[in-house]
């Protein structure tokens, strides 16, 4: 699996805004949108293109378009914030959804939604989630994609923790690439990324209201 840490001044600047505890929901959301577009740009640099003739106001030029646009799959809830940035870069992409919430007692992912095409074989998939912490949610989502035949998976995460990256690398799952803005060294006692940026879903949308024990 290829791991790409995007080291760019604008990436570092937006990431700093997201890390800052003083950033309110609006500021955090705007920074996430900018950073999301930058990471999708990096993640898409090896998508296959096809050429065609395009008429300019002067003559004919060679044009290019994606031969097989990817499907963008956010892990709900925080991943929802990455849909618009992804579509701004790849407007002809499809969108699927995987809903996973973290059980705060066990730190394990609890699935509650799946909306994916029946057959993803031969289809580039970009699995997007701002955080890769323990790796539990991401691996759960990758396994769902594989069950639907996915064989070309790129994970796009803004902040990754080394334990989660190691878990993904050692999973044996067919993830081709991880694109991230940073790899933080550790998790705290509550399995949050340290230093991280807190709960991305809460900082985007406010505290969640999902009763996991009733599911």
UniProtKB/Swiss-Prot annotation:
5-phospho-alpha-D-ribose 1-diphosphate binds at residues 77, 102, 129-137, 199. Its cofactor is Mg(2+). It comes from the Bacteria. This is Uracil phosphoribosyltransferase. Disulfide bonds: none annotated. The keyword Cell inner membrane does not apply. Pfam families: UPRTase. Binds 1 Mg(2+) ion per subunit. The magnesium is bound as Mg-PRPP. Its EC number is 2.4.2.9. Keywords: Allosteric enzyme, Glycosyltransferase, GTP-binding, Magnesium, Nucleotide-binding, Transferase. One of its GO terms (biological process) is UMP salvage. Uracil binds at residues 193, 198-200. Catalyzes the conversion of uracil and 5-phospho-alpha-D-ribose 1-diphosphate (PRPP) to UMP and diphosphate. Coiled coil: none annotated. GO terms for molecular function: GTP binding; magnesium ion binding; uracil phosphoribosyltransferase activity. Allosterically activated by GTP. SUPFAM superfamilies: PRTase-like. Pathway: Pyrimidine metabolism; UMP biosynthesis via salvage pathway; UMP from uracil: step 1/1. It comes from Corynebacterium urealyticum (strain ATCC 43042 / DSM 7109). It catalyses: UMP + diphosphate = 5-phospho-alpha-D-ribose 1-diphosphate + uracil. Belongs to the UPRTase family.
